[in-house]
């Protein structure tokens, strides 16, 4: 565990007090603090204030990912006995299952959506459920360090789901039609349009909405973050016939294909250059051993480390290599009995590894910037004394270069966006 709540109460930063006060004043609002900047305790501060006003009877629902609830809420928060007594924790996947009707039948005073970027897709089941839950809740709080994926529409979808600033009254189609510029694409079923940016004439309104109902907190020079060393290890790769065919598939998809079609084509080439491919029946066909495996010993021999992978086929290779030196369970890794923590790139939310290791190796990298950013902040956090080392293993002159470039580009846009919001 990092900072306890009692310690936090004596060390609150001004932005944390301001965040708590904004939540209480606006009632439906979001904290968009960078990972590690401390957004959970301001939310708990607000919950405790609301609970006191309701004579200890506030009904609170906290929705988060399974990883966050298992690795953070139940480990670091619940044992401190600081949540209102009528607090219920539920995973996003459980919430959209059989208990959804039970949740909707309950009158909640407060809905908290942790890692609220989980509702940025307006067509997802969790977005629709959160929208219904927050519609009648007196308070609805969202928090995430990665609110923006590809565009501001991602942020708006979160505001809509939580009914922040009156955005719940809009449908997605009506809002985008009024406020957004569109990009035209062509797919198998003809022409389609995708909202990309806020129309220039509406930017002042949009910025005012965010300023009033959302608090963005970026890293600053006073944080004393440890140095972050990113090492791109380019591994020689002899292109095989299978890779050439897979790469050709990307080109043949065409400029106007849907995003899904493009991602499928890229994913096939990515798999093949790592020695395997998933066939339509989900059977893995292997072409050759992944040459990246030989590069991992250097980092494991130096110190304990996290190895991030994308597909189960990668996990199987890593398990064969490291055997009982590795685990995929965070709590087991924290005991110190294992040299290696194997994490699938989607399982990277909310837990703290800064006292366990300071090296993260991306064995196979997902193109998602949000997953990348969430992962590096498991180790690179406030209060850490040791430099953090990020290693990206990349087969040279393959699609992996483009995947890393896409992540870097989104990182630059995110950094610029957060710095602009902080200074306004």
Language model region names:
Residues 92-107:
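Conserved helix/coil segment N-terminal to the catalytic DExD/H
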Residues 120, 315, 323-403, 410:
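Conserved RecA-like P-loop NTPase helicase motor core
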Residues 14-22:
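Pre-Walker A adenine-sensing motif
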Residues 67-87, 162-165:
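Conserved helix-turn-beta segment of the N-terminal RecA-like "Helicase ATP-binding" lobe
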Residues 40-42, 57-77, 149-154, 310-312:
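Conserved Walker A/P-loop ATP-binding site and its immediately adjacent core
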Residues 59, 110, 127-219, 384-387:
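Conserved P-loop NTPase motor "coupling/switch" region that bridges the ATPase
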Residues 114-115:
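Walker B catalytic acidic pair
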Residues 1-10, 24-28, 34-38, 42-54, ...:
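Conserved Helicase C-terminal RecA-like lobe
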């Amino acid at each position: 565990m990092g900072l306890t709540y009692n310690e936090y109460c004596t060390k609150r930063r001004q932005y944390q007090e301001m965040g708590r006060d904004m939540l209480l004043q606006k009632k439906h609002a979001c904290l968009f603090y960078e990972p590690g900047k401390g957004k959970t305790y301001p939310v708990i501060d607000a919950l405790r204030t609301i609970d006191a006003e309701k004579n200890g009877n506030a009904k609170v629902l906290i929705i988060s990912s399974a990883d966050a609830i298992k690795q953070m809420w139940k480990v670091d928060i619940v044992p401190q006995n600081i949540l209102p007594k009528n607090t219920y924790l539920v995973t996003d996947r459980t919430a959209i299952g059989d208990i959804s009707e039970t949740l909707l039948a309950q009158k909640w005073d407060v809905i908290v959506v942790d890692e609220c970027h989980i509702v940025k897709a307006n067509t997802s089941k969790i977005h629709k459920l959160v929208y219904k839950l927050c519609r009648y809740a007196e308070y609805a709080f969202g928090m995430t360090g990665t609110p923006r994926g590809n565009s501001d529409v991602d942020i708006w979808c979160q505001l809509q789901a939580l009914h922040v600033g009156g955005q719940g009254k809009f449908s997605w189609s009506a809002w985008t039609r009024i406020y957004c510029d569109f990009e035209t694409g062509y797919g198998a079923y003809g022409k389609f349009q995708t909202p990309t940016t806020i129309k220039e004439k509406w930017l002042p309104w949009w910025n005012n909405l965010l300023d009033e109902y959302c608090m963005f907190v970026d890293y600053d020079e006073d944080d004393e973050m440890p140095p972050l060393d990113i090492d791109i290890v380019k591994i020689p790769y002899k292109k095989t016939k299978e890779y050439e065919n897979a790469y050709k598939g990307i080109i043949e998809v065409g400029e106007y294909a849907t995003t899904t079609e493009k991602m499928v084509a890229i994913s096939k080439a990515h798999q093949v250059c790592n020695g395997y491919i998933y066939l339509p029946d989900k059977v893995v066909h292997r072409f050759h051993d992944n040459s990246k495996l030989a590069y991992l010993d250097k980092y494991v021999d130096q110190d304990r480390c996290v190895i991030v992978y994308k597909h189960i086929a990668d996990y199987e290779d890593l398990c064969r290599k490291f055997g009982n030196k590795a685990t995929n369970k965070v709590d087991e890794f924290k005991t110190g009995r294992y040299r290696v923590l194997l994490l699938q790139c989607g399982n990277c939310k909310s837990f703290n590894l800064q006292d366990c290791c300071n090296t993260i190796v991306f064995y196979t990298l997902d193109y998602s910037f949000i997953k990348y950013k969430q992962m590096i902040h498991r180790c690179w956090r406030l209060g850490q004394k040791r430099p953090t080392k990020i290693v990206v293993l990349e087969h040279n002159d393959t699609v992996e270069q483009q995947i890393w470039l896409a992540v870097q580009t989104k990182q630059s846009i995110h950094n610029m966006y957060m710095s602009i919001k902080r200074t306004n």
